[in-house]
């Protein structure tokens, strides 16, 4: 949630826990299944509780509506056959119906205008395609090969798009190198607020399953989502995107190491990604 839509944000420390344990709420929601969050939920006083709590020394659902997500988290065989999106599951846990409500996000209009002016001068009327190359050190199985990013960027440029590499501090050196090899613009890495503003200049975003997926969704951008290790039903693209996966099912379900030794992200070729992008452009 945008900070300006939250009345009070408490740090997770002893004083905050003490205050929460001695407060009364109309509704308490905890979607986190980590032990510390569930123990706190059990101690908080509320007229209605949704999500997860702590009972008999273990995580437990506050209501039966939260059981489904708890079981899919415990058992991969249940998670693999799930056909509900994350958003649908979250709403159901809170005893509500998901009606394609949009994400909430705060956009710094001044920063957005700054970057929009820069991109308008560079793109010469072409559609801007943001290429998000990173996925963080935790999820190496989501990384796409550098040479694939270069090939995709060149293909996009040749077909009349204006590609732009995007990423955080961890991807900076890589994006500089990719930019030089592909002859494609890379604006640099910035704080989150600036990154959101920069992303808003894009017409289409190409990304793996990362924070960028959520940012692009919140900004209502068209999106090509490369997915291997997750159940594709979990993602809600609001009719604005396409999910691209490997030709054969991924065996590294929710894993950070590929069981076959070679990441199935390598099986997603640049031409397939381009074709998916072109279908929603």
What are these regions (language model features)?
Residues 1-281:
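Catalytic machinery of carbohydrate-active enzymes
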């Amino acid at each position: 949630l945008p900070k300006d839509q939250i009345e009070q944000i408490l740090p997770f420390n002893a004083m905050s826990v003490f205050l929460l344990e001695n407060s009364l709420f109309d509704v308490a929601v905890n979607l986190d299944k980590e032990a510390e969050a569930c123990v706190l939920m059990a101690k908080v006083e509320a007229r209605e509780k949704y999500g997860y709590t702590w009972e008999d020394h273990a995580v437990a659902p506050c209501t039966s509506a939260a059981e489904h997500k708890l079981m899919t988290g415990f058992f991969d065989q249940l998670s693999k056959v799930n056909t509900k999106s994350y958003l649908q599951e979250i709403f159901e846990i809170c005893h509500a119906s998901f009606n394609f409500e949009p994400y909430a996000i705060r956009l710094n209009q001044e920063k957005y205008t700054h970057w929009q002016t820069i991109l308008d001068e560079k793109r010469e009327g072409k559609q801007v395609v943001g290429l998000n190359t990173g996925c963080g050190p935790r999820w190496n199985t989501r990384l796409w090969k550098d040479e694939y990013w270069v090939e995709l960027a060149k293909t996009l440029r040749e077909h009349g798009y204006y590609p732009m590499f995007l990423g955080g501090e961890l991807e900076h050196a890589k994006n500089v190198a990719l930019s030089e090899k592909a002859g494609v613009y890379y604006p640099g890495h910035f704080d989150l607020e600036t990154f959101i503003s920069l992303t808003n200049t894009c017409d289409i975003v190409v990304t793996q399953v990362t924070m960028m997926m959520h940012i692009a969704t919140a900004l209502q951008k068209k999106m090509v989502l490369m997915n291997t290790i997750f159940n594709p039903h979990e993602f809600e693209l609001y009719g604005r995107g396409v999910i691209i996966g490997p030709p054969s099912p991924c065996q590294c379900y929710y894993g950070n190491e590929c069981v076959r030794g070679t990441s199935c992200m390598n099986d997603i070729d640049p031409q397939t990604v381009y074709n998916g992008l072109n279908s929603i452009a």
